[in-house]
Amino acid sequence: MNTLNDAAATQKSGPAHYDPDEWALRCALANCYHLIDYMGWTETIFNHISARLPGDAHEYLVNPFSLNYTEITPENLLKVDIDGQKVESSPFDGNPAGFALHGALHQARDDIRCIIHTHTTPISAVVQKKNGFDHNSFYGAQLFGRIGYHTFEGITLYEHERPRMVASLGDKHILALRNHGIAVAEGSVAKAFFLLWTVQRAAEVQCAAGALPGDDNPLPLPIQEKCAEQTAMLIRDSGFANKFFDAMVRKMKAETGRGW
């Protein structure tokens, strides 16, 4: 297996009216939606994942609102502009609650190519706590210095919240939405999925540890910093995330027989 562009994560060729790069991105994003459902991280038809298309137009792909994640295919993904307006005809509309978040981050950061927003129970529980994520587990340490926190202002429907979300994220790749959920923002679909998996594991371990008696064994600050730097390097400089994503797609398809 090579990369997500020609391995299990995509189909090798698509309809003639699609540019090959766009079709590869559509396939990767559709597989990501199916994976999020497979992992049990969905909230029925809610939440959203976006992938920015190549070029300077800041157009991106996102899920049609009303479809289950398992019903999403490469062809029924919406193509929208930075304000959430459809740029291609579709019988579906998007979720207005997603446009402010995704549009703001895609417009502000050219290094961001995929954003996954969800609120699993462990993640929502952790971001409800005043101190948010700790960094004392194997997974939590990998997130040290990589999380921006954003104060809950209600459902993200309004453009006036955009600059504050951008400021809260800064140069980081994880936006913890206090009392709400999480948005991970990375340079590819595979990288974003791997980062979300790490965040989810950190939240699960933190919740489990918090339910046990006794004090935590805190990790020294230099170890937390080292773990975060190592993980960032693996995501940035290697095919680590692609290998993980492709393997998870193969596992999902082997166990569920999913396709489109």
Predicted regions and their residues:
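Class I SAM-dependent methyltransferase SAM-binding "motif I" and its flanking Rossmann-like core
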Residues: 121-163
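Divalent metal-coordination and catalytic microenvironments
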Residues: 51, 105, 119, 165, ...
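An anion-binding catalytic pocket shared by soluble metabolic enzymes
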Residues: 15, 23-116, 123-134, 140
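Short histidine-centered catalytic/ligand-binding loop motif
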Residues: 18, 89-92, 148-155
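A general structural signal for well-ordered alpha-helical packing
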Residues: 102, 123, 162-166, 189, ...
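Short, intrinsically disordered, mixed-charge
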Residues: 107-110, 131, 167-170, 197-201
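A conserved C-terminal secondary-structure "cap"
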Residues: 2-32, 173-260
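A contiguous binding-surface segment within folded domains or other stable secondary-structure elements
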Residues: 148-184
